[in-house]
Amino acid sequence: MLSFKQETNKIKDLPPLEQLSLTDLKHMVQQAITNKDFYFTSNPEEPTSEIISNHEEITIWGIPLLKDERTDVVLLKFLRAREFKVNESFNMLKNTLRWRKAFSIDELVDESLGDDLDKVVFMHGNDKEGHPVCYNVYGEFENKELYLKTFADEEKRTRFLKWRIQFLERSIRKLDFRPGGISTIFQVSDLKNSPGPGKKELRWATKQALQLLQDNYPEFVSKQVFINVPWWYLAFYSMMSPFMTQRTKSKFVFASPARTAEVLFKYVSPEHVPIQYGGLSVDYCDCNPEFTIDDSAAVVTVKPMTKQTVEIIVNEKCTLVWELRVVGWEVSYGAEYVPNNGDNYTINVQKPKKMAPTDEPVISHSYKINELGKLLLTIDNPTSKKKKLLYRFKVEPLPE
């Protein structure tokens, strides 16, 4: 199997043959613009002279195809999608520009298509390398009303594709196409409660979307992680696999429900992972004023049938604030404070409490400290499964 490692967008770091391919493609693009080969219209009866006067500059995703520092990164995407075969890359670019014009993609960006699908696809946080993370939540279509509203007939399915393209276009325009910038998206597809393979309407829309993305949005996925993967999906994937390039498949990662949080944490820090997927991140609001996505969290593995104690040293009088969770709970949690005064006593901050999977996913506590010492957070895992403990804390000075 071919391997595709992280690739550079800095021209000086490209191998000589790839630099040559980029130079050749830029020359072909220049010639095509000079010869007006990139001027397309969605109206075949519109005079060519009028098309040209209305399009003095050829752009894609808001980026000019000539004389812009971001142009090289755009062209590299097409080259990589076609394994640096210049003619094939040029034809892909030309077909993409034609498709964008035929479907009025630039105008679609500003259309109002409603907010019915806001919970189906959304952006939240970044991965460890800085790529924005996009979540695709297929379980939302378990709602029969939403499913029919989205897929019941061809007109509705086409509208869904338009909405999905619009969402992607808006996300792409927030990327950084400068050399060395972040110009790809980390994709997460949540298959929990996803409609099964018998839902032909969803299957059709998925296949259509996949084809459109592969043909017209090359190299925009840094990684594609499927979480909460049910048994039947791997069979479905094997059916879809022939329609995907090897390059696309090399970016795929699959995680069962039991390993979802563990796999996400490999790529995304827990403070960036939404609470519903095992992380600590919620939309900032009055109910969560202490911690934000910028406050880093630690991850500790609690082995089966063991106790794990986290020690937080306190070197000043303050209010100590902490937040923690154990993914899936089924543990006991307690907290105590041990002053440094040599009297060998501890202060019970939180008596050991059994935490069930149905309890609040995240616990927040604070404790006012007048004597220097240490806070001990103890997790007792009586199960035969290892657990992931997430925690973070901050020190707030006492008022004068």
Protein language model features and the residues they cover:
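Basic, amphipathic alpha-helical/coil surface patches used to engage anionic, phosphate-bearing ligands
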Residues: M1-E400
